[in-house]
């Protein structure tokens, strides 16, 4: 929604559809991810409007900027998480706290996948990929194929020994020489997806699914605390009865 400051005209603006579904389903709690730009001053009216709509539907709303790297994901990926809890539930939700340890580096995360095709340089590469990666972006239908982002992002990937202009279909072979590219499976792992997770479609479609996704470890941390809040309410209602 806020990535290019296109607001309501952006094809990625899903808030109207979300509001419609919330009104129809009336879930106990809601969790929505958005880009960091959602918190900028230019979107103040938009934020207030969203909060007002959710209040009319019977929800208390809060949002916070969370970094995926604080929850074990090996990339920066700062994202705004919007949480709304239905009014008939006790306000027992607490935001999750960061893990006490640093996330793994790109090299630590991907060394086995880089070596899967027999590439003899995988371990050396992993030692050089000694930091977390920049934010993985999925783009939209208006943008090109599966690259790792704009020029600045590709330069950041280059410092980690990754060519970001496109993706490989498979891991480097035994005699590969040069700077490797990521596969969709590698990108999925960097995004926090378990290896057994299945994606559908060709490479570009799969990459967009992964890049536009909410990292599962962050989603789990927030959802776990929401579940606790719901349990507190249920327990409260039983005792009150």
Residue locations for each model-derived region?
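Class I S-adenosyl-L-methionine
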Residues: 1-158, 236
